[in-house]
């Protein structure tokens, strides 16, 4: 393994890294950082949980001249959650160097951001729409930018951000370094690389690292109407410390979180329709452990970096295999073990095969637990807790009463009574969830999403009346491209949570191939 001291980083960054408890670099960090420090353009293919933020963050921070009061680097991320997470990590890494980091994203008061921009941050981390909004307002100037990072570029493509990214890249100086990270490399991302990058160094994490060997993966064949009972029985049997349950739509997330609370589980949901304050509140409670189950849509959970997640439950099978990899990457981090469960309805077996092809891993089948098995699972958990108490606690104060009880009852009866009192009886409160259509793989291959509605039987099931939906645009926008509150960072993730009819790989926005503006870049290649 390569240590961070071998990578040629400055002393102030090494001090931060070591204070965070890191000594050895991950594979993506060890391969990326030396090339990036030399000023080379980088294409990095890596999933979340591989340490890619530090892979681009360390060389980005290393180049910053803190004596200059100007923006020297920008990181473009697909969602506000990821922008916040990346900003927090860069702040920690750049703390001893005193690098000023500013996250900017939609959903936050733009005037507050304008005031913060006047304090001369060195690095901006933001979503494409909000960055472009500040550029157009002339509240963000990029004339001194030396490094541009595109984080989760394929996800930004899926959310319809390619045109915004091209507009941002045409506004940075001709001579700059570009670091592009993407789990996959669809054609529009390749075209971005060809146009805006110079002889990029291509770094790819090996398949065995991408498929996350620390995660045990299981699938259960279960009918749609029985999924909720199966989920609660698994929660009773497995008793996860922290669990994330993935639903396909915002409606599903709302109904699931409410139903789990009715059954006695501490659960809350997160999706694109929540206010930023509410999202942060839910995430804080989840990190603190005051809620044990987080129910989320794919986009809302994108970029979350929460330690201690032991279980991921895919209540709804994802629309595409790549989303499955992102989902299960919430667990099994930092060398710890994790468990991922996938619910598969009878018509979704083809999508299961697609996922297994992508991950290069055959999942183990698990039978859906019965009510009796859930009860037995609860009893075994209580028995383990009792045994731990016997081995680790001082019980002298309780032994006199225990001896009196044993004079009148046999020991087995006493222990059985204790188990009964402590066991959480499986709740069978009737729950009615709105059924979601199955994701049916078509043509035996990886399903493309677009005009066919992303696998829904009736096409794009949440399209707006004017026929739009799936390109991530919000109907509330007026003619100048802004929504009612002037927030140009259109809530793409909100529409995507409930409406997955997004463009397939290989498709950007109409007319996006030419970008905006004709100004040449140092790395732009001649047109044939």
UniProtKB/Swiss-Prot annotation:
Residues 518-528 have a biased composition (Basic residues). DEAD-box RNA helicase possibly involved in RNA degradation. Unwinds dsRNA in both 5'- and 3'-directions, has RNA-dependent ATPase activity. GO terms for biological process: response to cold; RNA catabolic process. CDD domains: DEADc, SF2_C_DEAD. It catalyses: ATP + H2O = ADP + phosphate + H(+). Its main location: cytoplasm. The gene is cshA. The keyword ATP-binding applies. One of its GO terms (cellular component) is ribosome. Residues 458-506 have a biased composition (Basic and acidic residues). Oligomerizes, may be a member of the RNA degradosome. Residues 428-528 are annotated as: Disordered. Belongs to the DEAD box helicase family. CshA subfamily. This is DEAD-box ATP-dependent RNA helicase CshA. SUPFAM superfamilies: P-loop containing nucleoside triphosphate hydrolases. InterPro entries: DEAD/DEAH_box_helicase_dom, DEAD_box_RNA_helicases, DEAD_helicase_CshA, Helicase_ATP-bd, Helicase_C-like, P-loop_NTPase, RNA-helicase_DEAD-box_CS, RNA_helicase_DEAD_Q_motif.
